[in-house]
C-alpha cells in the first residue's frame, strides 16, 4: 500500500479523563514517564503527556470522559510477555475486566 502522506508511526493517542492525577498515577505505575504537563487555556483543560519507549499518550482532564459504548475505552499496549504482565496486573490493585487473556 502506498504511503502517500509519509506517515511513519503514531505520534500519540489522546485520552480524555475525569481525573488527570489518577490517570497519570496509573500510567506511571505501569512504567510510563511524564514528559510534559501543562494547562490548555483555550480548552480549559489540564494536559499530561506520558511516554514509555517510543509510545506516547496524551491525557487531558475535560470532565466529560464517558465509559459507555462508542466511547474511547482502551489503549492496547505491546508488552514483552503478556502472560507475565496479566498476572502482575491481576496481583495489583487494578480492576481486571476480563477473566482471561484475549489474543488478537
Regions picked out by a protein language model, each given a short descriptive name:
Residues 7-8, 14-56:
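Core segments of cupin and vicinal oxygen chelate
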Residues 8-19, 48-51, 65-90:
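Vicinal oxygen chelate
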Residues 58-61:
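Acidic-residue sensor for enzyme active/binding pockets
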Residues 102-104:
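Conserved small/polar residues in nucleotide/adenosyl-binding loops
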Amino acid at each position: 500500500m502506498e504511503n502517500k502522506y509519509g506517515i511513519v508511526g503514531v505520534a500519540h493517542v489522546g485520552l480524555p479523563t475525569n481525573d488527570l492525577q489518577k490517570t497519570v498515577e496509573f500510567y506511571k505505575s505501569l512504567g510510563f514517564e511524564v514528559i510534559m504537563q501543562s494547562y490548555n487555556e483555550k480548552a480549559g483543560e489540564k494536559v499530561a503527556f506520558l511516554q514509555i519507549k517510543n509510545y506516547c499518550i496524551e491525557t487531558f482532564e475535560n470532565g466529560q470522559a464517558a465509559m459507555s459504548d462508542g466511547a474511547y475505552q482502551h489503549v492496547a499496549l505491546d508488552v514483552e510477555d503478556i502472560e507475565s504482565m496479566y498476572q502482575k496486573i491481576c496481583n495489583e490493585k487494578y480492576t481486571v475486566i476480563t477473566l482471561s487473556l484475549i489474543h488478537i
